[in-house]
Amino acid sequence: MPTGPLCALLLAWWDEHGRHDIPWKQARASGQPDPYGIWIAEVMLQQTQLQVVLPYWQRWMEAFPTVDALAAADEQQVLLLWQGLGYYSRARRLHQAAQQLQGQPWPQDLEAWLALPGIGRSTAGSILSSAFDRPFAILDGNVKRVLARLTAFEQPPARHSAHFWDLSEQLLDRQRPRDFNQARMDLGATLSTPRQPDCPRCPWQSHCAAYAAGSPEQFPVKESPKPLPLQVIGVGVVLNEAGEVLIDQRLNEGLLGGLWEFPGGKQEPGEDIEATVVRELHEELAIEVEVTEPLISLDHAYSHKRLRFVVHLCGWVSGEPKPLASQQVRWVMPGDL
């Protein structure tokens, strides 16, 4: 692979057409961008597109402008500000990492960043190159797609992570790693998009094996889709005589850790959904309820499963609510939710 010409072509394209207005990439008075802002942005970008992240990042930086401010924040404040971005464990790990980084110099090597909660190899490489102009490779979705097309790789990239990391390391401009990594991401985000890649404007068109084959949109090769399993969740909106509803806070570990919810759980095989609600609320909160009327049914899909939430209104019969499978429980007025 002619890495020298490829690097020169991409950087020349990026100098003229790249996304130069990303706020966390802007230099401060010192001439360098803020490592804190870059770290926050890179974690937000792990599962979320740039245009979605931008307003969240702005609000975050206003609320927690420094590592010290984030470290001192209450976890519920952190989760509330993250609300809407999803994958809430990212916010919790940022909070934990801030408490580790507080009062310390910024890490300058890959191993130190990987030792922090919520930081993988690509995120660490992106922080080191973006914040400190260090020559570390990245391999996010955009870069993986660009490399798969450049080489017309005939297998799903997820099965060949080591191969793509080798390619990314080989194809890294060590004189301008900050700009080059951003250029790779910009190329994937603006020209070599998942659908309808804009090959005529691509600086790598003459070197691209997928373009030469006449089918760039067929790369990267996709895994055969597997049907997602469906789980039905019975949920109870429990009312007491004061008109309050019962909510509980999930354990920190696992999906949606630390968030508040109406209580409920998985339907067992052969079980009526009303029986699911009664059983789950007894097992998890030590209360007895009467299921009265259905309220709503909602479907939601994750990458690995589908969930159907079947929600019923319930009357509180007996038992003082206890957090047997959660952090805490609380009666609140509906207007305070």
Positions of the model-derived regions?
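N-terminal strand-loop-strand
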Residues: Q205, S215-E261, E290
